[in-house]
Amino acid sequence: MKKMMILSALALFSSSLFAANLTLQKEITPQIVNGEGVTLQEVHNGNRIELKPGHNQIAVTIGQIVFEDGKRRKFDSQPLLLEFVAKPEQALTLEYGKFRTIDDAKKFENNPTVHLTDAQGNPVAFTMVQLYKGGLQGFRDYEREVADYNAQKAQKADSAPLVNHDPKAMDLKTAFKEMTRQEQQAFMQWAMQNLK
C-alpha cells in the first residue's frame, strides 16, 4: 500500500515536472485545452497554463477594449482553435497584435493572426481555425463546439486544409508567388523530378 501511494505521488509529480508552459497575452483567454474546459485554478499567475508534452489543441478567445465612435466598447473574438506540438519543459508564448478601434478588431475577426513562439522568440509551427457561430451568442458551449469540430474533421479527412503557420512553408509560398511564370514552371519541373 505504501509503495502504491509513493508511485501515485511520483506519477503526479513527474507529469507536471515535464509539462510545457504556455503564457498567453493578457487579453487572450483559454477556453479549452485538449478537449477539456479550463478552470481558473488551471490558469497560473501571468496567464500561464500547463500543457502536456506532444500534440496539444487549445481554443482561445480574445477580449479587448476598443474605441467605436469615440466610446469604449468590449470586443470578444470568435474562438480560435490552435493545434501544435509542445516539447517537454518547453516555454511557449501566444500573442497577437493589439487593436485600438472596432475597425481593427473587425479586420482581425476576418483574418485572425496570432504568434506562437518559444522562449528564444523563435516561431513555433501551428495550425489554426476560427470556430464561427452566427446569431445570438449569449452563452457558448466551447467544449461542444470543439468536440463537434473534431468529429467533423475526423469524418472529412480530405476537407479544406487548415491555415499553416510554419515559417519555412510561408517563406516558400512567398518566394513562389514572387517568381515569374517561367521561373515558376522551372521550379515545378524541378520539384516534380525531386519528389520523394
UniProtKB/Swiss-Prot annotation:
A Pfam family recorded for this sequence: DUF2057
Lineage: superkingdom: Bacteria
Keywords on record: Signal
Listed InterPro entries: UPF0319
Residues in the signal sequence: 1-19
Family: Belongs to the UPF0319 family.
HAMAP family: UPF0319 (MF_00789)
Protein name: UPF0319 protein VV0948
